[in-house]
């Protein structure tokens, strides 16, 4: 598969290839740059060296050089206008990239325009340079990855007091764990959807190395919680009502799951049924 790259503006649903020979332009260079590093450094007062507590990345510069030439289906002087939809700094277009190797993932990063030049050059051509800043420096796999852990069902036997016709609840079901695996370069902090019925739910990773614990609050059947382990938020159902106080903070160790290895995810709860489950979702994160 040849390299592919394109811009997409969600606000206008406009997609534009970075290279389109039939239209009359080619991307001669796409530089994804490297994120700035947010230095947290202090000089040691009475000795050589520094105290370096640097951990995080800043934004990422992205540049692309595009050359327009005569003879395509679009007049050469109209081609710079094809890119202006992505150069409004109030817009947040997406840059999509697929590299040329077997199994290459589609990567996406949200960018913001920072500069645009398009000088007229002799012989007849236009050499454009588009510059962007990516506030979030991580290239994300476009495919949403998921894993599910089932709490299992514990109810079994006859229902009493006896009524006719006799009814039997579903038999017990063993818990089923899920597996989280990222092929990216950076750790995963998944988004969790916890489906009831469940009381005092607990989601464990790697045999309790990391734990997201809830208080004794009850998630009713048909309800769910959305827990973002990266931003540390918790909302109920789709209305966005915050239930952050349902997090048992004293027993929670937020997951930061290293890439390239399997991580187990399991769920326990009081009085679960066959539909009690936790679904984890994430996008693999890449530096380059």
What are these regions (language model features)?
Residues 1-43:
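Polar/acidic, low-complexity leader/linker segments enriched in S/T/G and N/D
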Residues 44-51, 115-116, 176:
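Short amphipathic beta-strand starts and helix->beta connectors
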Residues 47-75, 124-137, 262-263:
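Oligomerization/assembly interface segments of phage tail-like spikes and tubes
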Residues 56-60, 87-89, 122-126, 182-188, ...:
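Solvent-exposed loop and beta-edge segments used for protein-protein assembly and interaction
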Residues 60-110:
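Long, hydrophobic/aromatic-enriched structural stretches that serve as scaffold segments
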Residues 76-91, 142-159:
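Charged, amphipathic alpha-helical segments and their flanking helix caps
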Residues 92-141:
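Short beta-strand and beta-hairpin "edge-sheet" elements
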Residues 145-288:
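Intrinsically disordered, low-complexity segments enriched in serine, threonine, and glycine
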